Amino acid sequence: MVGMRLSEMLIDQGYEVAHLSRNPDKVSSYKTFKWNVKENHIDDNAITYADYIINLAGASVAEEKWTEERKKEILQSRVDSINLLYNCLQKTEHHVKGFISASAIGIYGNSGDQLMSEESTYADDFLAQVCKAWENAAWQMRDLHLRTVIFRLGIVLSNKGGA
């Protein structure tokens, strides 16, 4: 949901947008490159095509019961996707200037009505641990001299779906 709306907004601003997908042959309005995080595969052309990478990848936290297996998938889908991008950027000649990654306000835990900022204390529950690992994976992009930005999403609501 976030990715599609962001893509629309970027197109409206005159940017070219491409997506990564496990099913690039699916009909899409956007140029689409194949990747499969579980198989550690990404089309190298995706990296050479990009000026900036916006990473929103991650298994939904709301779709299934949190079994130990599902929790592992929630964590790994976020961290492994960034690690795959990092490894590909490291070995491929590219002109990527920046890396933007999602994270979540879950890093703060249940804070009630308390106003939170980047300096606020992080929680230590499962979602906070996921967010910390997710952000740590993203920050490694600075080692490649890429401007790195992380934004923390809250609950997403839309007339097309959401929490």
Give residue spans per PLM region:
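N-terminal Rossmann-fold NAD(P) dinucleotide-binding loop
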Residues: 3-4
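Aromatic pocket-lining residues of Rossmann-like dinucleotide-binding sites
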Residues: 10
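SDR active-site strand-loop-helix element
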Residues: 20, 56-57, 99-105, 151-153
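N-terminal Rossmann-fold cofactor-binding loop
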Residues: 20-24, 36-37
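NAD(P)H-binding glycine-rich loop region in Rossmannoid oxidoreductase-like domains
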Residues: 34-81
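Short-chain dehydrogenase/reductase
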Residues: 75-79, 116, 120-135
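Conserved Rossmann-fold NAD(P)-dependent oxidoreductase catalytic core, especially the SDR/UDP-sugar
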Residues: 83-125
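Conserved beta-loop-beta element that borders a ligand/cofactor-binding pocket
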Residues: 103, 136-159
